[in-house]
Amino acid sequence: MLKRSSWLAALLGLLTVVSTSTHTYAIELDEATRTVPLESSGRTVILTPEQVKRGKRLFNNSCAICHNGGITKTNPNIGLDPESLGLATPQRDTIEGLVDYMKDPTSYDGAESIAELHPSIKSAEIFPKMRNLTDEDLFTIAGHILLQPKIVSEKWGGGKIYY
């Protein structure tokens, strides 16, 4: 009985130490890092830490199968890096531009709809991962895409040489 109670006391002591330690292993992002372009007029928005986490989770669940690391598996010439997003027509280097694209995607030159080829809200019946995404979800996914170049720099959208 004494052995059992000493093991129990040791286990409780260990649990107490583990539960009171406050280690944070996630990267802490300051406001400057979490600031991303909202619209083409130059307005910006500061993402909350919760939006950052949610955007990453939603991107990984809905987009990363084709865009892991900011690449585009079906067209390696066009990635999610800031340069590619900024050169698209219409530009997609803002939250507003990316949300519009996720709702109704167009070709890189903006000439034609590609909703039947690219997952979007418009084609949610074909791409079920898009079905339940709200405008807030799209906002946080766009925030994640625009935040990544600040965190992983040229690796985001850099392609095979980095991944």
From Swiss-Prot:
Signal peptide (residue range): 1-26
Topology of this chain in the membrane: Peripheral membrane protein
Gene3D superfamilies registered for this protein in UniProt: Cytochrome c-like domain
CC cofactor: heme c
Any one of the GO BP annotations: respiratory electron transport chain
InterPro entries from the UniProt entry: Cyt_c-like_dom, Cyt_c-like_dom_sf, Cytochrom_C550, PsbV_cyt_c550, PsbV_cyt_c550-like
UniProt keywords, alphabetically: Chloroplast, Electron transport, Heme, Iron, Membrane, Metal-binding, Photosynthesis, Photosystem II, Plastid, Signal, Thylakoid, Transport
Any GO molecular function: electron transfer activity
Bound cofactor: record note: Binds 1 heme c group covalently per subunit.
GO cellular component: chloroplast thylakoid membrane; photosystem II
Similarity comment: family membership: Belongs to the cytochrome c family. PsbV subfamily.
Oligomeric form and interacting partners: PSII is composed of 1 copy each of membrane proteins PsbA, PsbB, PsbC, PsbD, PsbE, PsbF, PsbH, PsbI, PsbJ, PsbK, PsbL, PsbM, PsbT, PsbY, PsbZ, Psb30/Ycf12, at least 3 peripheral proteins of the oxygen-evolving complex and a large number of cofactors. It forms dimeric complexes. The extrinsic subunits in red algae are PsbO (OEC33), PsbQ', cytochrome c-550 and PsbU.
Protein name in the entry: Photosystem II extrinsic protein V
Species: Pyropia yezoensis
Source taxonomy: Eukaryota, Rhodophyta, Bangiophyceae, Bangiales, Bangiaceae
